[in-house]
Amino acid sequence: MGHKKTVSIIGAGNVGEHIASLLVLKGAVNIRLFDLPKKDGEKLYAHVKGKALDMLQMACALGIDTDISGFVVDQNGNGYEALEGSDIVVITAGFPRKPGMSRDDLLGINISIMNTISEQIKKYAKNSIVIVVTNPVDIMTYAVYKLLGCNRKRVIGMAGVLDSSRFRTFISLELNVSPKDVHAYVIGGHGDEMVPLAGVSNVGGIPISTLIDEKKIKELVERTRFGGGEIVDYMGTSAYHAPAASVVEMIESVALNAKRVLTCSVLLDEEASKYYEAENLCVGVPVKLGENGVEKIVKVPMTDFERDLWMKSVASVKKNIAIADEFVSKYI
């Protein structure tokens, strides 16, 4: 067996833990899991170490040869030495929005967390590919890119892979076909103004417009745009199985140099900026992912209606980027 890549996951909450678990089951990479200690009353628990040990024993029970370790860190950046040698770093850590907290408050807190983590990445894993999962993901991806001061190809946000999988799911359910044969992309910001591209969506090469009537397509598009909220309404918390699986798709494309074309939040290059009419921001577009990160930004065709929705999505992201820049400027 060849050299296994090392993936470090910062944040062992629902999404981070499930990313690690899926990677363990695949057995293709070595895993390092980082998190703060968990407080219960007066006692602090090194829960990240327990989760890693539990997953290692799971691998043993299933006969999977893997390596996973847990590391306790603190809010001041201590404990990150094990990042050294990481090929890929996944950031899921972040602060959830609390009652009475404005979106600007949340941006400020999470950008502060991104700064602490970025400092440790620069110190111990400066050549790694960084995948950002923390929400709002387009803004956090932009912040990490600015804080790291690295090549734009190395910082990638997880957004469209998840949104596209939701769109594909709803199409496959509507037509009662395997999702393997459903090809669909969702671009734009990872929020209510995302843009599911019905115009290029197809099943086995057949456009969905010939298989599903226009009214139903609009319903599937709307369900996709609010797909995350639908799960919150059912569970009382955000999704984590599908987001984790989406991150694993990205990790595998990088770690195995698979060169998959996946929708990710990235900083557009000059050529793509002209086509997509979006400069100096991170937003979801199809990209080719390989061992060096973003190898190519793909120009996906849009109908006039989809282009209008795209421009609205870009405007929304741009507005939040301007707010984020004020917070980021405090650290660089």
Curated annotation (Swiss-Prot):
Residues binding substrate: 97, 103, 135, 166
Residues reported to bind NAD(+): 11-16, 35, 110, 133-135
Pfam families: Ldh_1_C, Ldh_1_N
Catalytic reaction list: (S)-malate + NAD(+) = oxaloacetate + NADH + H(+)
Enzyme Commission no: 1.1.1.37
Enzymatic class: oxidoreductase
Key words, A-Z: NAD, Oxidoreductase, Tricarboxylic acid cycle
Record-annotated active site: 190 (proton acceptor)
Keyword Oxidoreductase listed: yes
NAD is among the record's keywords: yes
Molecular function GO labels: L-lactate dehydrogenase activity; L-malate dehydrogenase (NAD+) activity
Family (UniProt): Belongs to the LDH/MDH superfamily. MDH type 3 family.
Record-linked PANTHER family: L-2-HYDROXYCARBOXYLATE DEHYDROGENASE (NAD(P)(+)), L-LACTATE DEHYDROGENASE
Function in brief: Catalyzes the reversible oxidation of malate to oxaloacetate.
Protein name as catalogued: Malate dehydrogenase
